[in-house]
């Protein structure tokens, strides 16, 4: 009877199957937010001393303690090699895989006590009532209008000079619980090359739930951080950013193959879809 009960439990933990068409552009976030224009009129840099003081309090007194409690005590997230970022004297860029809406929590804990800016979609600053809050917490939206790019790049350079760590998700789109690494472009790797700053990659891996209260978790989460990777100053800019991209990708790929072994959701290309088969649906519960 006990054996049968165990078998039944395993059957209930069915892996969802999602079919995708474009690894670079498919997005399963399902937010459907009407984007506001982020252009040359957008205020990327806040120099108001009172707003900066308020942002400091929100970040260190409220956000970081809440994030720490939720990540470590509720989700039991483990971090490996955080010291690689903490021991750096110069500011760096963080590059991570994008598998959860709460990925934005990881940089704050990886970098602490340093602050982190996170490059985000215009969606993040388009939600009425929270635009100022998310910016105070570090959101730096990528322009959806070409006129905003100059000021945006200036903002990246400004925060880099202020020794704030800047986090980028080169995959751009959320694929919940994805255990692999999606292909991504080298465009965003221009920033560390331009500023001659080191890069640290991090990879969120999912493994079989184990340990205290493991039955309440769909997967154990471990975030692996790379040692610093420096731009090759002997190469032309384009070649240097491609080399950085390839080194970050190689680290993520290695972590994926070694540590990300538990598939809560399985992603398959549409060409693998059997006739008459239907793709499972991404639910709100998948966005931990």
Please give the residue ranges for each predicted region:
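Short, basic, glycine/proline-bearing loop/turn elements
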Residues: 67-68, 136-143, 171-174
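Non-catalytic C-terminal accessory region of glycerolipid acyltransferases
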Residues: 2-38, 153-288
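Conserved beta-strand scaffold positions in the cores of enzyme catalytic domains, especially
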Residues: 79, 118, 139-141, 199-201, ...
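Membrane-anchoring hydrophobic helices of lipid-metabolizing enzymes
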Residues: 2-93, 102-106, 131, 136, ...
């Amino acid at each position: 009877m006990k054996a049968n009960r165990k078998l039944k439990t395993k059957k209930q933990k069915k892996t969802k199957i999602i079919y995708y068409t474009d690894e670079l552009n498919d997005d399963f976030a399902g937010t459907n937010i009407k984007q506001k224009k982020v252009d040359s009129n957008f205020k990327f840099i806040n120099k108001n001393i009172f707003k900066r003081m308020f942002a400091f309090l929100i970040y260190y007194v409220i956000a970081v303690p809440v994030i720490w409690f939720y990540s470590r005590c509720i989700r039991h997230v483990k971090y490996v090699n955080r010291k690689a970022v903490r021991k750096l004297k110069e500011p760096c860029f963080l590059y991570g895989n994008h598998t959860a809406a709460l990925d934005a929590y990881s940089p704050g804990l990886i970098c602490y006590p340093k602050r982190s800016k996170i490059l985000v979609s215009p969606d993040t600053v388009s939600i009425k009532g929270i635009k100022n809050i998310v910016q105070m917490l570090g959101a730096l939206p990528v322009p959806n209008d070409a006129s905003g790019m100059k000021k945006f790049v200036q903002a990246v350079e400004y925060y880099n000079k202020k020794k704030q760590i800047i986090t980028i998700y080169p995959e751009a789109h959320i694929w919940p619980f994805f255990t692999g690494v999606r292909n991504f472009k080298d465009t965003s790797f221009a920033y560390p090359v331009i500023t001659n700053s080191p890069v640290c990659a991090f990879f969120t891996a999912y493994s079989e739930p184990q340990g205290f209260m493991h039955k309440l978790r769909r997967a154990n989460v471990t975030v692996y951080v790379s040692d610093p990777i420096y731009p090759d100053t002997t190469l032309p800019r384009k070649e240097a950013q491609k080399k950085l991209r390839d080194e970050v990708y190689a680290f993520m790929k290695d972590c994926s193959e070694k540590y990300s072994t538990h598939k809560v959701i399985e992603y398959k290309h549409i060409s693998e879809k059997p006739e008459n088969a239907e793709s499972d649906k991404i639910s709100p519960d998948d966005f931990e």
